[in-house]
């Protein structure tokens, strides 16, 4: 996360609201003019069973003490992430559908970053009793739709009441080939990325700075700022690019959760090397952010290097590797010099990372 967003007041929520369709593009009148307190947990679980994708490998889904998911021979991989209202998202900026799609994407990208394919997700949700049920069920739809796109099931979870919306996802997957870790980078390798860089950070600055109306949607209302706002609200990482990178011989890889500066430093520290970004390549990425940079009057290079939450891949390849479609070279790997720590650099300077929840200086 680039940095903590400001905390706008929670929107007044009428008993009936307009919420986006399943794809979040159009707006339609709610069919559930109720608060969560008016619904039983059993009724919500029944809705989950009907709405969530079962998944291609699910043997037992929602309804038992555990789900059962078929696994190929070998190992499985598992990851978890949590999103907290007013820390990671604001319901005055994003729809429930976008929040659900976003939390799914960040977990699915972690599976992809290991060179894996997702099998199943479980979701634990804390929600306020006075939350509009239609907003809550839109979160369910966003989560389910994003999982369905990659053939993963949402096979269980837990519900509780609390002061704010909190969503914790655990994702399971398997690797069709060798697992790609963070610690395989070698001197002479090239560093490449997939997906957009800096779009989400630009969208955050546009919203936080009050440069756009938070209720605005689509190109019609947002113009050339739409890609940045939409990426912040619900990123669409190139899921599958991690599997392609693994097949192409990637030696180290991560999804871009916290931005290239931070995530490259993590690979460098794990591998005991220095990663150097190429200024021209970073400037080329930054040029795509020009519409937002003009509005916010900032250097978009900062967005590119420090912006996260887009969940494309940063991968390290042998110098003679044929890069998969969608990957662009942005730097290289060299050995540490005498008295030099493993780190990420550009123009001879150590790069400062992005936002950390507990310590602004921590990279792990």
What label would you give each PLM region?
Residues 172-174, 314-318:
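Short hydrophobic/aromatic beta-strand micro-patches
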Residues 36, 40, 235-236, 282-284, ...:
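Acidic, Ser/Thr/Pro-rich beta/coil linker or hinge segments at domain junctions
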Residues 2-14, 18-20, 25-28, 32:
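Short amphipathic, helix-prone segments within low-complexity/disordered or flexible regions
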Residues 130, 211, 226-307:
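Active-site-proximal betaalpha loop/short-helix elements
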Residues 31-95, 114, 123, 142-146, ...:
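Extreme N-terminal cap/leader segments of soluble proteins
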Residues 96-120, 141-149, 238-244, 259-267:
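Small-aliphatic-rich amphipathic alpha-helix that forms the alpha element of a beta-alpha
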Residues 60-61, 77-79, 153-157, 171, ...:
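General beta-strand structural signal in soluble alpha/beta enzymes
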Residues 71-73, 83, 118-212:
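Glycine-rich anion-binding loops of enzyme active sites
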């Amino acid at each position: 996360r680039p940095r903590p967003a400001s905390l706008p007041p929670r929107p007044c929520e009428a008993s009936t609201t307009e919420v986006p369709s399943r794809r979040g593009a159009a707006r339609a009148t709610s069919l559930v003019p109720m608060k969560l307190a008016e619904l039983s947990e059993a009724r919500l679980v029944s809705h989950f069973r009907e709405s969530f994708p079962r998944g291609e490998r699910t043997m037992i889904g929602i309804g038992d003490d555990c789900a059962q998911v078929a696994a190929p021979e070998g190992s499985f991989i598992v990851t978890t992430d949590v999103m907290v209202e007013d820390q990671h998202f604001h319901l005055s900026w994003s729809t429930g559908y976008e929040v659900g799609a976003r939390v799914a994407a960040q977990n699915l990208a972690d599976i992809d970053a290991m060179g894996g394919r997702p099998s199943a997700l479980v979701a634990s949700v804390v929600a306020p009793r006075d939350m509009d049920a239609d907003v809550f069920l839109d979160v369910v739809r966003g989560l389910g739709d994003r999982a369905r796109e990659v053939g993963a099931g949402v096979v269980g979870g837990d519900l509780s009441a609390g002061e704010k919306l909190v969503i914790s996802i655990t994702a399971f997957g398997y690797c069709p080939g060798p697992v790609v870790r963070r610690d395989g980078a070698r001197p002479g390798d090239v560093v490449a990325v997939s997906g957009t860089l800096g779009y989400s950070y630009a969208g955050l600055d546009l919203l936080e700075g009050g440069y756009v109306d938070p209720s605005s949607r689509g190109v019609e209302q947002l113009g050339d700022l739409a890609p940045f706002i939409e990426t912040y609200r619900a990123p669409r990482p190139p899921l599958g690019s991690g599997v392609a990178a693994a097949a192409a011989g990637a030696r180290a890889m991560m999804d871009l959760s916290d931005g290239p500066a931070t995530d490259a430093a993590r690979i460098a520290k794990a591998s005991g090397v220095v990663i150097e970004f190429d200024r021209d390549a970073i400037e080329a990425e930054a040029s795509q952010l020009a519409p937002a940079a003009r509005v916010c009057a900032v250097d978009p290079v900062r967005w590119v290097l420090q912006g996260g939450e887009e969940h494309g891949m940063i991968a390290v390849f042998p110098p003679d590797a044929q890069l998969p479609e969608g990957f662009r070279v942005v730097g290289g790997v060299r050995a540490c010099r005498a008295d030099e720590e493993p780190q990420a650099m550009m123009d001879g300077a150590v790069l400062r990372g992005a936002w950390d929840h507990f310590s602004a200086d921590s990279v792990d």
